[in-house]
Amino acid sequence: EEKIIDALKTMKILLKNRALLKISGNDAEEFLQNQFTNDIKKLDRKKVQFNAYCQHQGKVIAFFWVMRMGEDFLLSFPDELLEKIENRLKIFVIMSDVIIENVTNVLSQTGLINESSPNECRINDELAVVIEDSNGQSVELAENHIAWEKAYLDSHLPEIYNVTSEKLVPQMLNL
């Protein structure tokens, strides 16, 4: 266990187990504002904003990292929830000028532990994520999901997976 902690001092990890949806269109900000628990209008371009997506009884379906990319928004979450989330969000688009696009295979997500990058979105003081074109990766990245998950859990940040989806309310996640 001590060796894992030492290895976490600085690290870049390819986050292959996370899905990425792009939300765009003239009504994207208002659409997300009406769907999630946090104030999307206060989203800082260089930071990750945490948001819960709840069903009608108030139970959390998913927990997102929301980021801005130009005028668009990116939602990052465990890939096992992709189909469920994408389909559910599309139900609520109705007449809004909103496009929901799965960009998981187009853009890559790199987790940074105690490192920085000019293109980063900060999660907290220790963790950040970089979103870039999947073809543009020039650095060999570790695929050590256990190291990332340990650092993420050590930061006391929640995560929702299929097994916990629609089981908890935001207060149980300290949101």
Regions found by a protein language model. Give the residues of each.
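Basic, glycine/lysine-rich polyanion-binding surfaces/domains
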Residues: E1-L175
